[in-house]
Amino acid sequence: MQLMKEKQDLTYLSWSVYRNSSGTAGSFLKAYSELGGTKTYYKLSNFDKARGIIGHECVNELIVDRLLTILGIPHLSYQLIHADVTVDGKAHEVYLCASEDFKAKSESKIALDAYKELETLPDESALDFCTRMGWKDYIYQMLVVDYLILNRDRHGANIEVLRNSRKKTVRLAPLFDHGLSLLCSCSDDAAAAKFDVMADKPCNNYIGSKSTWDNLRIIPKDKMPKLTPLHESDRQVLLEGLDGVISQTLQDKIWEMIWKRWCAYEDFCNSR
């Protein structure tokens, strides 16, 4: 079940800060559990000690998960769960996201930027390194995704390398961690209503420039990813069940953003 609205008791989870949020007073908290041999990771949206949840990054994870499923792009699956949690001894009712460990047995993980430092050639760019490793198609798909959702934070640790030293295999983890995207900077409906969904805002990209639009030009015109087209009817799929989780204004604006950017991407492909 991708969306669990029936409230769960997750007060047993122990939360730790994994990133302070930029531009706000909050922070991002994570936890994990190991039940029945399965490791599950949990994340909260932007969290403030005084006010509780002040963001909707976990909802973004679910929406982007659904989007990538429609487009046919491999990715990590997320579950959005209505739950009671305890942070610093205080109870909070939240919507959090959960995902399973994407590492196979005997695999270890390392951030792409750290792996590149170990294996790079002199003066080799991140893109050239990934191309040499045979990962260019993955990178091209990632650049398209990051444009469609305006991913603000595809830094070098937001792409992970999975290594199996026994089998001597190296692969990239499925695309993950898309919370800082879409309208993540909008804390209320007024901000969402004014948000320019096509604005080319600077993003923290490990590969390419800070512009997700300019980064589309990195992809050779004969190498544009073959994606399943998005249709207006897909709005219902992307936003199913989110009434009462996020506002109608936010839902409408998120769809407007995804649809307009998809149309711009199609125009870009057709003009090359």
Could you say what each language-model-derived stretch is?
Residues 89-93, 98-143, 244, 264:
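ATP-dependent phospho-/nucleotidyl transfer catalytic cores
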Residues 1-110:
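Conserved ATP-binding subdomain of kinase catalytic cores across diverse folds
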Residues 122-187:
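Conserved kinase catalytic-core segment
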Residues 8-16, 128-144, 184-190, 203-215:
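A short, terminal or domain-edge coil/loop segment
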Residues 166-272:
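C-terminal catalytic region of ATP-dependent kinase domains
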Residues 57, 61, 138, 152-155, ...:
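Active-site-proximal structural scaffolding
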Residues 78-86, 157-164, 271-272:
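Short alpha-helical "patches" and their helix-cap loops
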Residues 62, 66-70, 137, 141-145, ...:
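A broad, structural surface signal
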